[in-house]
Amino acid sequence: MQYLLEYIRQYGRFQRNARLYLISMALSYVTVGIITVLYNLYLIALGYNTDFIGLILFIGTLGAALTIIPAGVCVDRFGGKLVLIWSSVLIGFAGAGQILFRTSVPLLVSAFIAGIGGAFILVVNAPFLALNSSEEERPHLFSINLVIMLVATVVGETFGGLLPLWFAAGHTLMGPLPAWLNGALAAKNQARAYQLSLLTASVIAAPSFIPLFMMEDDRLLYRRQQTATTEERRHFSELWNTSVTRIRAFFAPGYHTRLRSALARPLTVLTALYAFQGLGAGLFIPYMNVYFVQHLGASPALFGSIDGAANILNALLTLIAPWFVVRIGILATLLIPRLLAIPLMLVIGCVPYLPLAAGLYPVRQGLADMSQGILQVFSMERVARKHRGVANSSYQVAYQGMWAIGASLGGLVIQNVGYPVVFISAAVLYCLAYLPLWWRFRLDTKSERPS
């Protein structure tokens, strides 16, 4: 209780832009929670299969990947406020297209545009919070931001699971409508219930624009930062030239020995870890709502509750992860929960029994994700300080790129072979990710110097 009161007091001390940002995120992530539960189910109700869902996910990620660098340039040029406003507008229009359009090409175009908008939000998030806070405020600000995102998502997932039931119970919009309105809504009752629920989610997101317009202009802050980072850009240019020289030297005679040495470097092992994790996660995680509702027979409301419980348990286990680091060490904290989660995942995917899957799903997610923050710290500490920016970019590209590929492949495999194959494949990929991590850092994770 004392910690809660301290965070509430700290919120009042945050800068104006930071407080308004948190309010906007709270409203936005309720909508995110609703969409997380319902959008794939909406596509299934329209008659699409999981292979098309995989294509939608891939196209959205492709749009984001192509926009990451231009988004960073726009943030530096126009500031966080304008980027937040216009990217939210773009996501709003794309989201409306994803809900109202029902043919494949407009849905894919809408997903691509939504990915572009999402890239801007992703790029502006951390720098905006950092620029609009002091060094003392940042730990509290980033923690509160994560908690708000989690709580709002859980609320959205719970609410989103109930909305289709409410509309299907006899709402006026489910009956005969004027021709102009009838054409905008899906003909099938189940698809229309999902569609109306998603439209409700967009209405909930609309007030999130108000705090953005109330923010103070922050372009001057970004210009000062841009001036301050000139030296960093010069260093990056030098690092790039050095890297090119090293690559040329690498393929000189005797490169087999250098190859073995390069594969054993912490950066290589950790990048491979993120790549295998991303590929494995992409195979099945985007389809869990379809798996529970379509394959196991759960209602959307039940899945929303299950996923909400998983997020809550994940948050609680994340809070105690540092305690495990002190007791059993950082490498054991990273590996043991994740390895324990693998058999639980196999039971969920290979034993089609709803009560069992509903009970194991939150535990699996909590074990798999509880040390995610610890992994981020570990991944940074294992490389030299001057290379951490490049390392973080490598990790993100590896994870997000392989996740997109996994999501596309997962949809095809589920459609043509079934669910057990994707769960088994994900288990193999997770083992390929974790075993090299243990092999590389098993001897001494404390005294080993960064490379």
Features from the language model and the residues they span:
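Juxtamembrane intracellular "pre-TM" segments in multi-pass secondary transporters
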Residues: 1-15, 217-272, 451
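Helix-loop boundary and gating motifs at the non-cytosolic
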Residues: 3-63, 266-308
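Conserved MFS/SLC helix-loop-helix module at the cytosolic interface between two early adjacent transmembrane helices
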Residues: 66-102
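Helix-to-loop junctions at the C-terminal end of transmembrane segments
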Residues: 67-79, 164, 317-330, 414-415
